[in-house]
């Protein structure tokens, strides 16, 4: 399998995207990233193939996707005025990478059905179906509601080697991700102060309503 580019500036974007996807997989990808040196037009039968054949062999209905598409244009990076609405602890956690004291936040023991969003932007981050009791003292999830909403960074602070997770639009510090989740999964260890929880029954009639099938 390969990804081929015509503009050398695209190479870094492709490699960054692959690195983010690789974080969700244990086996290394076997995907080459190379300049496009040869290109041949397909025969007429395959021109505009899916327009001519809506149920064609290479068509995958979006409705079968296991995770939703989160439109990044629907959310904005918070302004200084927006950040002033945060509590002192929420500000310290999201903006200065502070950490909630273990077992101190109410969302640690929240297990109702609903959606967890970035407290600084409202961007969806986690669904309740992926939350589990980790007994570590912080809200824990096996995966985000969609891969693209999380950013990953190496964190060597405090004499440890960890992977920090931040929100896509707000660049808010969320917590860290570890490899000790249930049944070989990951554990996203998230500060409750970085999250806002919206119960399932409050999603109806909002811009989040389409996400209901992905939180149960």
Language model features with spans:
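Flexible coil/turn and secondary-structure edge motifs
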Residues: 1-216
């Amino acid at each position: 399998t390969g990804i081929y580019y015509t503009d050398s500036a695209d190479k870094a974007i492709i490699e960054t995207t692959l690195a983010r996807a690789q974080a969700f997989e244990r086996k290394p990808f076997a995907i080459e990233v190379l300049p496009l040196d040869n290109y041949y037009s397909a025969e007429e039968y395959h021109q505009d193939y899916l327009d001519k054949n809506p149920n064609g062999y290479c068509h995958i209905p979006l409705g079968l996707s296991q995770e939703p598409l989160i439109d990044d244009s629907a959310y904005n990076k918070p302004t200084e005025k927006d950040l002033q609405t945060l509590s002192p602890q929420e500000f310290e956690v999201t903006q200065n990478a502070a950490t909630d004291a273990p077992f101190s936040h109410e969302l640690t023991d929240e297990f109702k059905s609903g959606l967890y969003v970035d407290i600084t932007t409202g961007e969806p981050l986690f669904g309740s179906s992926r939350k589990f009791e980790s007994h570590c003292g912080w809200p824990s999830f096996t995966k985000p509601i969609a891969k693209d909403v999380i950013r990953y960074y190496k964190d060597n602070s405090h004499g440890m080697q960890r992977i920090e997770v931040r929100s896509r639009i707000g660049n808010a510090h969320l917590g860290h991700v570890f490899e000790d989740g249930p049944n070989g999964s990951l554990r996203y260890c998230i500060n409750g102060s970085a999250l806002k929880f919206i119960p399932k029954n409050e999603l109806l009639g909002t811009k989040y309503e389409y996400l209901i099938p992905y939180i149960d």
